[in-house]
Amino acid sequence: MVIIHSPSYDLHNHEGHVENSGRTRAILRAIESSDLSPRFVEPGMAGIDDILMVHSSTHVEYLEVFAGRGGGWLDYDTYMTPESFSVARLSAGGAMLAAEEALRDGWSYSLGRPPGHHATYDRSMGFCIFNNIAIAIEHARRNLGVSRPLVLDFDVHHGNGTSSIFYRDRDVMYISIHQDPRTLFPGTGFIDETGSGEGEGFNLNIPMPRGSGNREYLWILGMILPAVLEGFRPDMIFVSAGFDAHRRDPLAEIMVDEEFFSWIGWFIHQTGLPCTAVLEGGYDPEALGRSNIAFMRGLDGEEYEPETAAPGGVSEIFSQLSDRFSAYFNF
């Protein structure tokens, strides 16, 4: 069990903002109070050339200058401190190192911030500076021999940045389960956003109704994930690990709890594939700590017997997905 973390992540911090250094401190406290014994590894910064694998040079240069002038607000909810450019490079470097460790040890977890899955090719947004998981994926493809990565994003918000970066790529399978984008930021992640060009069919969104809980999440993922794994045949799994779908989280209206995070960790473990998880959202400190422990136990192979899954109000969503992806996967 390998966790990538640096105390320097705390230098990107705004105490009046929900995305603050207390998030990772809550997770570290939960680990310390548990019986888990991970090996902690401190990362180095991603090189500028690494960042440019998924971001434009103009955008990267702008962020460096912006932070150098003292930082501030990139938009209405995304901040930078004077240290944020370096810390964001460190967070991306942590995700890259996590990919390397997963290929050696089976699974790893980049416990870094700022998060990344909303960052697009040329824009930082949604608390995200650089797209950490996309950088790690490109590092794995170009340098580590990975050819068919699958991305599972269970953050409650659609990972519009990751989706857009790989939208035309047939060799990266992106799956996101998130709250209905008609009711939540960033307003993307509809069923008909399936990829384009050669990437058509390799971008799969599962928009969940407000109030969905463990039973609905387990049912629809249990119907979809095995079929996608069989059809796509990935050689590595990358997880955008957001915990803001928890019922206690203040930013959304999905109602899962630790049982879901236990199950999804255990499901990934059962695939036998190397897995890198990268921290995304989760804004209730207590729930964030408990959910991370549950997820890590599952990834580490602790068997989990889920509660009875049931379609509830999501059977129509599954029907639409089945029709839309019938040419690609046998749901």
Swiss-Prot record:
Entry's Gene Ontology molecular function annotations: histone deacetylase activity; hydrolase activity; metal ion binding
CDD domains from the UniProt entry: HDAC_classII_APAH
Binding residues annotated for Zn(2+), in chain numbering: 155, 157, 244
GO biological-process terms attached to the record: epigenetic regulation of gene expression
Keyword Chloroplast recorded: no
EC identifiers of the protein: 3.5.1.-
Cofactors demanded by this protein: Zn(2+)
Catalytic residues identified in the record: 118 (proton donor/acceptor)
Keyword annotations of the record: Hydrolase, Metal-binding, Zinc
One Pfam family in the UniProt entry: Hist_deacetyl
Cofactor: binding details: Binds 1 zinc ion per subunit.
Site (Polarizes the scissile carbonyl of the substrate): 283
Parts of the chain that traverse the membrane: none
Keyword presence, Metal-binding: yes
UniProt record similarity statement: Belongs to the histone deacetylase family.
Known function: Probable deacetylase.
Name of the protein described by the UniProt record: Probable deacetylase MTH_1194
Organism (species): Methanothermobacter thermautotrophicus (strain ATCC 29096 / DSM 1053 / JCM 10044 / NBRC 100330 / Delta H) (Methanobacterium thermoautotrophicum)
